[in-house]
Design a protein with these regions (language model features):
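Composition-driven detection of intrinsically disordered, low-complexity segments
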Residues: 7-8, 91
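Extended amphipathic alpha-helical heptad-repeat regions
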Residues: 64, 68-134
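Domain-level detector for secreted/extracellular nuclease and nuclease-toxin modules, and
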Residues: 24-73
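Cleavable N-terminal signal peptides
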Residues: 10-11, 21
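Sec-dependent signal peptide cleavage junction
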Residues: 17-25
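Positively charged n-region of N-terminal signal peptides that target proteins for export
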Residues: 1-4
Length: 134
């Protein structure tokens, strides 16, 4: 009985250690979206996307496939909503809208399948820099 328990416990530990961790999702904290928010990249599907989520795992921005241009409008709305609480001026909104494609340009040309965690962090920081200057 003791051997069976030891064997069972050993197998359990081995399975826990050997269980695969998804290498297709990379996350990096995003200063722009506030504490606890991350920019996550998921490459499980043919269309890779970024999604912004908070520490309660609530989706904040959107699922944004890169090859669907209509999602640019949805992303504009998400960014606009982030700004609305701080500054409701027309000037701020027009600057956000005029620069939104620059934000997309950073992510569009990445080879997402080969992007490592440090690269995800780098591009999240670059997005933050763009957001701060909108």
């Amino acid at each position: 009985m003791k051997k069976l328990l030891c064997l069972t416990a050993g197998l359990f530990v081995l399975l826990c250690i050997a269980s695969p961790v998804s290498a297709s999702t990379y996350s990096a904290e995003s200063r722009y979206f506030g504490p606890g928010y991350e920019v996550s990249m998921n490459t499980d599907t043919r269309m890779s996307y970024w999604i912004v989520w908070n520490s309660q795992d609530e989706a904040k921005a959107l699922d944004i496939p890169f090859d669907e241009i209509q999602n640019v409008d949805a992303f504009k709305d998400a960014v606009d909503n982030c700004y609305r609480a701080e500054n409701d001026s027309i000037i701020a909104k027009s600057r956000i809208w005029s620069n939104i494609l620059n934000i997309f340009a950073i992510f569009r040309y990445m080879d997402l399948r080969d992007t490592a965690l440090d690269e995800a962090s780098y591009y999240a920081e670059q997005a933050d820099v763009l957001f701060e200057h909108l």
